[in-house]
């Protein structure tokens, strides 16, 4: 059963109607919708790769996953990063870094910087809301971070926008349902 909508649209009332709509499409319409979906996915990937090149960061957008940086950033804030190698690292700067043996990058503030005569830089980080520095988070035997450990430096943020990502990771069924709805929408959307 299909409810009436705006001119040129229709709204399926059950998940079975979605499959019925797919069966009603001729091959040409189905290929067009699949191609449309593929173009959306490839456009998103091209935009992401373009951001990587423009920002110099392997991950130009990250979500704050804990409260360790409060009050500066809260859980769910979306951070925009850059990572230009020629920019010096300074105390007070907020960096995102990876630690060997951990999959998820950490967002913390640089509290100490040591620069050697040969130009090598080592630095120490700490979460604003943490009591102690991050030496306990670094790999065993590592007391300082180096520039190679930095994924990016925070240049801007959107508050709480990343909560969607956190919810999707905490509730995988929600993530798959959302992806299925979006995929069905793209496949079933008809040009008017």
Curated annotation (Swiss-Prot):
GO terms for cellular component: signal peptidase complex. May undergo processing at the N-terminus. Its EC number is 3.4.21.89. Keywords: Endoplasmic reticulum, Hydrolase, Membrane, Protease, Signal-anchor, Transmembrane, Transmembrane helix. It is found in: Endoplasmic reticulum membrane. The active site is at 68 (charge relay system), 108 (charge relay system), 134 (charge relay system). PROSITE patterns: SPASE_I_1 (PS00501), SPASE_I_3 (PS00761). InterPro entries: LexA/Signal_pep-like_sf (IPR036286), Pept_S26A_signal_pept_1_CS (IPR019758), Pept_S26A_signal_pept_1_Ser-AS (IPR019756), Peptidase_S24_S26A/B/C (IPR015927), Peptidase_S26 (IPR019533), Peptidase_S26B (IPR001733). It catalyses: Cleavage of hydrophobic, N-terminal signal or leader sequences from secreted and periplasmic proteins. Its main location: endoplasmic reticulum. The chain crosses the membrane at residues 29-48. Residues 177-188 are annotated as: C-terminal short (CTS) helix. One of its GO terms (biological process) is signal peptide processing. Residues 1-28 are cytoplasmic. Residues 49-192 are lumenal. SUPFAM superfamilies: LexA/Signal peptidase. GO terms for molecular function: serine-type endopeptidase activity. Pfam families: Peptidase_S24 (PF00717). It is a single-pass type II membrane protein. Belongs to the peptidase S26B family. Catalytic component of the signal peptidase complex (SPC) which catalyzes the cleavage of N-terminal signal sequences from nascent proteins as they are translocated into the lumen of the endoplasmic reticulum. Specifically cleaves N-terminal signal peptides that contain a hydrophobic alpha-helix (h-region) shorter than 18-20 amino acids. Component of the signal peptidase complex paralog C (SPC-C) composed of a catalytic subunit SEC11C and three accessory subunits SPCS1, SPCS2 and SPCS3. Within the complex, interacts with SPCS2 and SPCS3. The complex induces a local thinning of the ER membrane which is used to measure the length of the signal peptide (SP) h-region of protein substrates. This ensures the selectivity of the complex towards h-regions shorter than 18-20 amino acids. The C-terminal short (CTS) helix is essential for catalytic activity. It may be accommodated as a transmembrane helix in the thinned membrane environment of the complex, similarly to the signal peptide in the complex substrates. PANTHER family: SIGNAL PEPTIDASE COMPLEX CATALYTIC SUBUNIT SEC11, SIGNAL PEPTIDASE COMPLEX CATALYTIC SUBUNIT SEC11C. This is Signal peptidase complex catalytic subunit SEC11C. It comes from Mus musculus.
């Amino acid at each position: 059963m299909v409810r009436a909508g705006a001119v040129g649209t229709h709204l399926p009332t059950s998940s079975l109607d979605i499959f019925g709509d797919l069966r009603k499409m001729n091959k040409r319409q189905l290929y067009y919708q699949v191609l449309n979906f593929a173009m959306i996915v490839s456009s998103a990937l091209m935009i992401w790769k373009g951001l990587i090149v423009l920002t110099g960061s392997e991950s130009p957008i990250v979500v704050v996953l804990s409260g360790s940086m409060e009050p500066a950033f809260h859980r769910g804030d979306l951070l925009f990063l850059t990572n230009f190698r020629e920019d010096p690292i300074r105390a007070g700067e907020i960096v995102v870094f990876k630690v060997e043996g951990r999959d998820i990058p950490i967002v913390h503030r640089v509290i100490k910087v040591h620069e050697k005569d040969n130009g090598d830089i080592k630095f120490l980080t700490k979460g604003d809301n943490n009591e102690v520095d991050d030496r306990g988070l670094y790999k065993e035997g590592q007391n300082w971070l180096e520039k190679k450990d930095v994924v990016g430096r925070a240049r801007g943020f959107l508050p709480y926008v990343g909560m969607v990502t956190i919810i999707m990771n905490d509730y995988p069924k929600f993530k798959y349902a959302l992806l299925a709805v979006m995929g069905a929408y793209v496949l079933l959307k008809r040009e008017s």
